Structure formats: C-alpha cells, structure tokens
C-alpha cells in the first residue's frame, strides 16, 4: 500500500512539530523549507491537520502552528485513517463482473487491517523517542 504525498507530508509535519519544545510555534515557511515541499501544498496539509484537531494554527504576525494533541496521543494509524482513501480496489458489481465470486476483496481487507493495526501501535512520540539522528536532522539552523 502506498500513502499519498499528502499523508506523507502530514506525518512529516507532525513529527517535526513534535520535535519542537512544547507549545512552541513554527511557521509554514520553516516546514516547507525543511522538507522541500511547495507552500501551496503545505498550506492544504496544515489546514486539514487543523480541521482534524492535530494542529493549532495562530494567525497574525506572531502566529504559526503547533501540535494540538500530545505526540503520545497521535497514532500513525489514526492519521492514515483520517487522510487516506483506504479502499484498495473498486469491487462494485458495476466495475467488476467477478465481484460476486471473488475472494480477493476479503484478502485485501485483511491485509489493510493488518497494515493499520501495525500503524496503530506507533505514535508520533515513538518515532522521535531515542532517535537522536532524527532530532539532529530536524533541528533548526
């Protein structure tokens, strides 16, 4: 299963925000520069993360973004569920005439559940914990 770039950038952003001191603000420019992502795309990612309650955005000259939830409360599986279309194949009868007898849909459903279960066991905090190399790469200049 391949995640969309939108979800990839969202996860990277959450990891970066979790690496900052608690309640410290950063801005979109800092995030886009760090990950080499277009500002336009990152604005959409941040807005969606805000709508979902993962980040808090503060408008104005001294504004920015920060985590709204504690890193230990954010599971990778939860983020993926919130952002990804998780239908692996289109098994509607209109689309595929073998759907009534096909066993592939059941296997794919089990694989998807196993994939998400693995991601549910991982929090944003765990991705940073005891990972000094990652913290160095995320450090502000």
UniProtKB/Swiss-Prot annotation:
NCBIfam families: PRK11014.1, rrf2_super. One of its GO terms (biological process) is negative regulation of DNA-templated transcription. Keywords: 2Fe-2S, DNA-binding, Iron, Iron-sulfur, Metal-binding, Repressor, Transcription, Transcription regulation. Binds 1 [2Fe-2S] cluster per subunit. The gene is nsrR. Nitric oxide-sensitive repressor of genes involved in protecting the cell against nitrosative stress. May require iron for activity. Residues 28-51 bind DNA. [2Fe-2S] cluster binds at residues 91, 96, 102. PROSITE patterns: HTH_RRF2_1, HTH_RRF2_2. One of its GO terms (cellular component) is cytosol. One of its GO terms (molecular function) is 2 iron, 2 sulfur cluster binding. Pfam families: Rrf2. InterPro entries: TR_Rrf2-type_CS, Tscrpt_reg_Rrf2, Tscrpt_rep_HTH_NsrR, WH-like_DNA-bd_sf, WH_DNA-bd_sf. This is HTH-type transcriptional repressor NsrR.
């Amino acid at each position: 299963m391949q995640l969309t770039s939108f979800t990839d950038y969202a996860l990277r952003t959450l990891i970066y925000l979790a690496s900052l001191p608690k309640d410290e603000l950063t801005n979109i420019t800092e995030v886009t520069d760090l990950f080499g992502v277009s500002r336009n795309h990152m604005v959409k990612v941040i807005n969606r993360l805000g709508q979902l309650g993962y980040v808090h955005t503060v408008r104005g000259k001294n504004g920015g973004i920060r985590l709204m939830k504690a890193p230990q409360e954010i599971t990778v599986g939860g983020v993926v569920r919130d952002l990804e279309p998780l239908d692996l194949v289109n098994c509607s009868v209109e689309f595929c005439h073998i759907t009534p007898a096909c066993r592939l849909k059941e296997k794919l459903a089990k694989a998807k559940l196993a994939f998400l279960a693995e991601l549910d066991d991982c929090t944003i905090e765990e991705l940073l914990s005891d990972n000094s190399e990652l913290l160095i790469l995320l450090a502000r200049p």
